[in-house]
């Protein structure tokens, strides 16, 4: 296990259960200068904000013109899987937005972190709009479309999965626990579905859907990176490894049940056992990014995911990031502690 940073304190279990005094955490201390960004005090947080800013995109940049041809060639199981993945994503982004608006934006008093969360909230709105547009495009029956858009209330397996992050929003747990909870949401809860959509890309299907998946998975990787940055570098009171594991393992179990049983990936021709292994691999990657040792020690089972990177390796982002680097926006951005759904470690 990585040593706790200097000045950090690992919380005893009883204090974890009760939460901690927010005033003890630098990120949460009252800050009379929080309404003004400059002078920048937290340069690493600011760099993450600028990195996120350089990755902005809109729904209008996604071409769905060829998707309907592929949609017509899919079998019923494949269409069922895609519909329900999109239905989950459409609602889950709204949950992340609510957490940002109700909790994280008021939890932190550091303007650089608030800037990141504010921009993340906007990007989550773009993700939510994207999934809604995809459903609106693919589903012609208005009644089915409404059922899928309201999946958190109408589809039991999606409702069950959504309950976990919703509980974190209303939780009295400390900020560091909720921070890891939502890192698990964006880093683990989305991983199986992202991977399944990349599988469609490998098969040469649904170019609009799979391109949007590249953009959104990249964003979510950056959001997970940011949570790890805050936890590793700016949280004074670390959680015990046992508590971190409890949160991560719980998220893995829920994701594994969802993508392997409730909405089985075999519907699109994927192996459920390998998908379960992949989710464990991703969870270990998140644990390492949080400064902990691996728990599952599972290896990356999908060769096609080796070609996928959430740090902007697509042509779209090579172009976008390059333009901003010329302007100096990201010229000093480092590459350490990046969270990925594909890279081994």
UniProtKB/Swiss-Prot annotation:
This is Ribonucleoside-diphosphate reductase small subunit. GO terms for biological process: deoxyribonucleotide biosynthetic process. Its EC number is 1.17.4.1. Heterodimer of a large and a small subunit. Belongs to the ribonucleoside diphosphate reductase small chain family. Fe cation 1 binds at residues 93, 124, 127. PANTHER family: RIBONUCLEOSIDE-DIPHOSPHATE REDUCTASE SMALL CHAIN, RIBONUCLEOSIDE-DIPHOSPHATE REDUCTASE SUBUNIT M2. Keywords: Deoxyribonucleotide synthesis, Iron, Metal-binding, Oxidoreductase. Its cofactor is Fe cation. The active site is at 131. It comes from Leishmania amazonensis. Binds 2 iron ions per subunit. Fe cation 2 binds at residues 124, 186, 220, 223. One of its GO terms (molecular function) is metal ion binding. The keyword Ion transport does not apply. Provides the precursors necessary for DNA synthesis. Catalyzes the biosynthesis of deoxyribonucleotides from the corresponding ribonucleotides.
């Amino acid at each position: 296990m990585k040593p706790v940073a200097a000045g950090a304190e690992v919380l005893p279990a009883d204090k974890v259960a009760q939460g901690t005094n927010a005033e003890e955490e630098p990120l949460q201390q009252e800050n009379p200068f929080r309404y003004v960004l400059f002078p920048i005090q937290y340069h690493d947080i600011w760099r993450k904000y600028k990195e996120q800013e350089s990755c902005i995109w809109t729904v209008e940049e996604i071409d769905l013109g060829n998707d309907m041809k592929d949609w017509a060639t899919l079998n019923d199981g494949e269409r069922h899987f895609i519909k329900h993945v999109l239905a989950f994503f459409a609602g889950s982004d709204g949950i992340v937005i609510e957490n940002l608006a109700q909790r994280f934006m008021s939890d932190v008093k550091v303007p650089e972190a608030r800037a990141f969360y504010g921009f993340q909230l906007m990007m989550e709105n773009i993700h939510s709009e994207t999934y809604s547009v995809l459903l609106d495009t693919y589903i012609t029956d208005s009644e089915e479309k409404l059922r899928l858009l309201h999946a958190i209330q109408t589809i039991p397996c999606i409702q069950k999965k959504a309950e976990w992050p919703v509980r974190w929003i209303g939780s009295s747990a400390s900020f560091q626990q909720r921070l890891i909870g939502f890192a698990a949401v964006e880093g683990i809860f989305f991983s199986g579905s992202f991977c399944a959509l990349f599988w469609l890309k490998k098969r040469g299907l649904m170019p609009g859907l799979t391109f949007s998946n590249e953009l959104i998975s990249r964003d979510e990787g950056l959001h997970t990176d940011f949570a790890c940055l805050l936890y590793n570098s700016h949280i004074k009171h670390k959680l015990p490894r046992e508590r971190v594991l409890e949160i991560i393992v719980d998220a893995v179990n829920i994701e594994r049940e969802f993508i392997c049983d409730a909405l089985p990936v075999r519907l699109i021709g994927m192996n459920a056992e390998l998908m379960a292994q992949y989710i464990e691999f991703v969870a270990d990657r998140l644990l390492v990014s949080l400064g902990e040792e691996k728990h599952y020690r599972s290896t990356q089972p999908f060769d096609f995911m080796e070609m996928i990177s959430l740090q902007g390796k697509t042509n779209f982002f090579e172009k976008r990031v390059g333009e901003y680097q010329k302007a100096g926006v990201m010229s000093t951005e480092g590459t350490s502690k990046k969270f990925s759904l594909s890279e081994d470690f």
